[in-house]
Amino acid sequence: MKLTLLGAPGAGKGTQADILSRKLGVPTISTGNILRSAIHDGTSVGLAAKSYIDKGQLVPDDVIIEIVQERLAQPDCAEGFILDGMPRTIPQAEALIAHGIELDTVLSLEISDEEIVQRMAGRRVCPRCGASYHVQMNPPRKDGVCDACGTALIIRADDAPETVRDRLHVYHEQTEPLKGFYEKLGLLRSVENVGSIEDVSREIFRSLGIGE
């Protein structure tokens, strides 16, 4: 299965993408993680992207498309993939189609802006491997430490409330129109992100027609 997850920053895309990845046996391709790795490594792409991410702005399409194309060409994507954070604009969606990257389903996670601001205040991320946690909804086994690699978790600058609101404005202006774009193609499925992580996962499985 080849699908992408849509939703505002903090809507739970990363968490649900990881669950779907294990369920379907296909990799999650997170543009956010790819870019953060590039920033951490000090690559030219990372340095170019850093100023946009820190301000809550979108990274230019040409940078995103190049990174995604390289990743999808790897062997582990042959049987399918889950895109997390791509596309973010209609031009990006059109570029995916133009480059022969076809999707089976587009899943949109729905949640209010105020709920997102509250949730992101509790988000913690691993600067080394990119794993994401939440102090209440998805805490690590040891407080402040990544389960996967043991690195101390951090609060990202773009999770600050004022930056979150800026990112939400960008989302509504530039990314939300994708729902209409994919609805016209018959690919869109929407799921309300309410209840526990497990509740939302069950609703996603039902929407995609896969068993628990």
Model-assigned labels for residue ranges:
Residues 1-212:
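Glycine-rich phosphate-binding loop of ATP-dependent small-molecule kinases
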